[in-house]
């Protein structure tokens, strides 16, 4: 089951000020990257269901995903990377594992993925209830358990799931573990910091994906659609820009126009 209106609702919340995008530690922070520096990365989030396998079925909701993604983007703002929600999919796991601790190997986890929701032009993030580690990154998909727990460190994030998700995305962007306790790539801690070398590496890796776009390029496309009076299509692109945690004229315009398109759509007579 997909949530087609969920992404536009995210943009509307951002425009109203109800969606709070904070830094990893829950505090507003300055950002050395400008709007034009930002790279936008699509992620499809999968909430896996398995009524006969409690170890698999996640209990996360769309409201949880709004919060989690906001905190993830607070972490990744230090690298000028923004993960936008391509879609949120709630779906039955393909091969539910009856083990009480959940699947623990590569085949067991990858076997949970329904084939109809896979695609090659984005990152895929799957949430389950239990597995032997907090999270794991495969070339095909990332898995995170919604019961993750971490060791607190000074200045660390205030919630495990956004940190584990951000850590695994770090692996997807080419980063190895680095056992500095306050670093995002340290194992099992709440740390979120990246050094300059890691920031450069993740940005270089992201640029290598054909499906990663610069904020300026996406804004140009959205504006062209808006001028052509293709408001729903424009709103889809504006919604990706509207949640960038940055005080910038372009972000404010994206919020305004995404919200405008949603209001126009809701006021249109039913077809």
Q: What is the predicted role of each segment?
A:
Residues 72-80, 168-169, 173-177, 189, ...:
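Sec/Tat-exported extracytoplasmic proteins
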Residues 31-33, 152-218:
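The catalytic-center signature of Zn2+-dependent metalloproteases
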Residues 1-7:
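N-terminal secretory signal peptides that target proteins for export/translocation
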Residues 11-21:
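Bacterial N-terminal signal peptides
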Residues 45, 85, 124-127, 143-144, ...:
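Structural recognition of the beta-strand scaffold that forms the well-ordered cores
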Residues 27-120, 131, 238, 245-246:
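Propeptide-to-catalytic entry region of secreted or membrane-anchored zinc metalloproteases
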Residues 33-35, 112-178:
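Active-site-proximal segment of zinc-dependent metalloprotease catalytic domains
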């Amino acid at each position: 089951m997909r949530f087609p209106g969920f992404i536009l609702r995210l943009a509307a919340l951002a425009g109203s000020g109800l969606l709070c995008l904070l830094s990893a530690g829950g505090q507003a922070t300055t950002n050395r990257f400008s709007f034009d520096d930002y790279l936008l990365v699509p992620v499809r989030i999968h909430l896996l269901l398995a009524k006969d396998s409690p170890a698999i079925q996640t209990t996360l909701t769309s409201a949880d995903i709004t919060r989690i993604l906001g905190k993830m983007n607070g972490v990744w703002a230090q690298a000028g990377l923004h993960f936008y929600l391509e879609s949120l999919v709630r779906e039955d796991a393909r091969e539910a594992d009856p083990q009480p601790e959940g699947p623990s190997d590569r085949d067991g986890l990858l076997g949970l993925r329904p084939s109809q929701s896979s695609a090659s032009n984005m990152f895929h993030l799957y949430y389950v209830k239990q597995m032997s580690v907090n999270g794991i990154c495969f070339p095909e998909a990332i898995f995170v358990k919604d019961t993750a727990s971490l060791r607190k460190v000074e200045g660390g994030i205030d919630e495990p799931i956004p940190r584990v998700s951000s850590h695994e995305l770090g692996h997807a962007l080419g980063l190895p573990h680095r056992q500095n306790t306050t670093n995002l790539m340290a194992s099992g801690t709440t740390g979120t910091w990246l050094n300059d070398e890691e920031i450069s590496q993740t940005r270089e890796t992201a640029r290598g994906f054909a499906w990663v776009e610069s904020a300026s390029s996406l804004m140009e496309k959205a504006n062209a659609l808006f001028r052509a009076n293709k408001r729903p299509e424009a709103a889809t692109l504006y919604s990706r820009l509207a949640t960038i945690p940055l005080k910038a004229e372009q972000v404010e315009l994206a919020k305004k126009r995404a919200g405008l398109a949603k209001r126009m759509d809701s006021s249109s007579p039913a077809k």
